[in-house]
């Protein structure tokens, strides 16, 4: 939505890049992760995914991802790709550990992974009928924190090396409540976390917005009824410019 729809594969590629980086990170540190430490590792990684999802959203909505014919385009979209990839680093590491350290067979773990992915796809479609995309992203982070709560119940979660005091990585229940509350509150206001620039247009978040609806790949916002010259693509040079009542759709 922040850019143009043909960049959907760019977003998917950023997600796959993050997951691959997470899996490689686990592989290069394979001696550090054992079957006994799996509950704690999955708990911390799920919490990391939840926190990174919220922080990534906060950065992403501030980026002016507009298509400009200058070298600025390269660092701009590089920054966007890295911001999008960070949460998936944690999810990729978690999936890699679940597949390689779990006491269950790979078939069972992979089936659970695919079932979760399918539920997530359908869940996003359902959630977007009730709230906006940034709020759904925050609620997705809450879902990851919920997974961390379940992982924590499977065994002890000792503090990670180098962490003297327990933080949110060790308190998935608190993280779940915070992200769920913020996600619900964000969906109840037009002044919450929202993109600054949408398809080359600066978002003003005016109170005159009459209707706003999101789906899996777009957003429609309708302004108030007003008098203005006809606004359309490819008008005839003979078309009258008499102002008419119309609404602005973005």
Which stretches of residues belong to each language-model region?
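Alpha-helical transmembrane segments of multi-pass membrane proteins
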Residues: 1-249
């Amino acid at each position: 939505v922040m850019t143009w729809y043909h960049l959907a594969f760019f977003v998917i590629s950023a997600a796959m890049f993050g997951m691959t980086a997470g899996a490689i990170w686990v592989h290069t540190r394979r001696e550090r992760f054992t079957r006994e430490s799996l509950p704690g590792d999955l708990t911390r990684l799920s919490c990391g995914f939840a926190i990174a999802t919220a922080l990534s959203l906060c950065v992403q909505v501030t980026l002016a991802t507009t298509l400009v014919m200058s070298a600025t385009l390269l660092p701009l979209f590089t920054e966007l790709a890295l911001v999008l990839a960070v949460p998936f680093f944690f999810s990729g590491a978690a999936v890699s550990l679940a597949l390689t350290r779990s006491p269950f067979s790979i078939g069972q773990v992979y089936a659970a992974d695919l079932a979760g992915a399918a539920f997530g796809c359908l869940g996003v479609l359902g959630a977007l009928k009730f709230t906006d995309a940034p709020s759904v992203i925050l609620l997705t982070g809450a879902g990851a924190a919920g997974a961390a709560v379940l992982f924590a119940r499977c065994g002890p979660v000792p503090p990670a090396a180098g962490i003297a005091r327990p933080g949110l990585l060790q308190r998935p229940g608190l993280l779940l409540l915070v992200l769920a509350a913020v996600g619900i509150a964000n969906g109840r206001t037009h002044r919450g976390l929202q993109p600054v620039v949408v398809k080359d247009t600066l978002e003003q978040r005016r109170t005159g917005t009459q209707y706003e609806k999101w789906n899996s790949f777009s957003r429609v916002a309708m302004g108030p009824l007003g008098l203005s010259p006809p606004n359309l693509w490819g008008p005839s040079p003979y078309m009258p410019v008499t102002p008419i009542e119309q609404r602005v759709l973005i």
